[in-house]
């Protein structure tokens, strides 16, 4: 008995050790310790320039940030690049921001001001710009590169189209400007639907827009190399899957943990032999199922991996409080519709049926909000929340 228990303990310890080794990134970069903290939102909307301030902070005080540079790329309403913007970067220490060039050695914490400038005429046909900030760190580990990608909204929302009747309801996609990390999405929703709501209407908000506003993004260019496990397990998925790339699989491992991913693969492989599909995602969890790999989102976020939103229930409650209407966060695409979170008065099955045509769109529509107006009241629909003024 003692020998058997010892063998089981040894096997468990060995499995944990190998799981830890396999899950470790194969390359660790000291530059990843540097974080960019936004201090002010982008100002200057409606003019030919955008201005914002950030703080570059190194968690390791022995690292010095050097060689800060910026490269900007603008995108038109058709999501194609436009060479119409220039970026300038000014740096300083503490709260002091002199208008000066980048210094050779900046220290472990730096105040950064970024300005995008372009002709006003050029900005009218743009919807976003990406700003790639790159730097190097120098310390006990030598020189190492680092960087991050910022997305700047440029264009304004266009007028919404006419409602589309779908039998049980009419749906109205409501456009907004591009949602970017750090946005108050509930405030954007309230402003976009002002004057367009009636009692009994329901708002369906895209889960991708919520995830982006929460900065649930992984930019493969700036992340550590995927682990050995991610590179190996990604080969188990068809090429069209978001988990078929090492970075996509690494995102799944980071979200659910390697043991759960291995268990999901085991159950998924066995049940597929008897004709059951989708078991992997049921075991791995909904956060893994919602991962969108590079190329799966609206440009310029098509260069990033978009993870599942973190606070969907709290978000729909906030939208309901601000707008006095029912709300839901939904994942809608050509494969189907799934409601992730909804206020108590939402008839989930009915809402999923109304959104089957994917009125949010999967292209460059910039319509993260869909207003659903029922043709007939639902017998299960609870009384609309009375707290907060109607939008």
Residue ranges and their predicted role:
Residues 2-391:
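N-terminal and secondary-structure boundary signal
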């Amino acid at each position: 008995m003692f020998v058997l228990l010892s063998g089981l303990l040894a096997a468990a310890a060995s499995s944990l050790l190998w799981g830890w080794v396999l899950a470790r990134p194969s390359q660790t970069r000291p530059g990843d310790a540097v974080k960019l903290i936004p201090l002010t939102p982008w100002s200057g909307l409606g003019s030919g320039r955008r201005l914002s301030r950030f703080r570059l902070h190194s968690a390791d005080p022995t690292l010095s940030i050097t060689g800060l540079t910026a490269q900007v790329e603008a995108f038109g309403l058709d999501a194609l690049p436009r060479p119409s913007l220039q970026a300038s970067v000014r740096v300083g220490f503490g709260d002091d921001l002199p208008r000066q060039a980048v210094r050779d050695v900046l220290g472990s914490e730096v105040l950064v001001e970024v300005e995008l400038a372009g002709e006003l005429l050029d900005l009218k046909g743009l919807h976003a710009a990406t700003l790639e900030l790159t730097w190097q760190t120098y310390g006990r580990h030598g020189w190492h590169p680092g960087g991050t990608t910022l997305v700047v909204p440029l264009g304004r929302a266009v007028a919404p189209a006419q409602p589309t009747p779908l039998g049980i309801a009419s749906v109205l996609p409501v456009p907004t400007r591009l949602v970017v990390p750090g946005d108050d999405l509930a405030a954007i929703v309230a402003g976009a639907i002002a004057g367009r709501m009636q009692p009994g209407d329901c708002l369906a908000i895209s889960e991708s827009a919520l995830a982006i506003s929460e900065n649930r993004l992984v930019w493969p260019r700036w992340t550590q190399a995927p682990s050995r496990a991610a590179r190996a397990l990604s080969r188990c998925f068809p090429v069209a899957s978001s988990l078929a790339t090492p970075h996509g699989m690494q995102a799944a491992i980071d979200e659910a943990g390697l043991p759960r991913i291995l268990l999901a693969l085991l159950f998924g492989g066995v049940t597929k032999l008897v004709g059951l599909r989708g078991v992997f995602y049921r075991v791995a969890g909904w956060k893994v199922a919602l991962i969108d790999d590079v190329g799966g989102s609206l440009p310029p976020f098509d260069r990033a991996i978009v993870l599942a939103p973190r606070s969907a229930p709290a978000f729909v409650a906030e939208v309901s409080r601000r707008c006095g209407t029912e709300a839901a966060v939904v994942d809608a695409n050509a494969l189907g519709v799934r409601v992730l979170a909804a206020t108590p008065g939402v008839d989930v099955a009915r809402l999923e049926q109304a959104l089957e045509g994917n009125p949010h769109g999967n292209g460059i529509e910039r319509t993260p909000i869909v207003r659903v107006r029922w043709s007939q009241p639902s017998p299960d629909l609870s009384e609309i929340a009375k707290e907060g003024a109607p939008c």
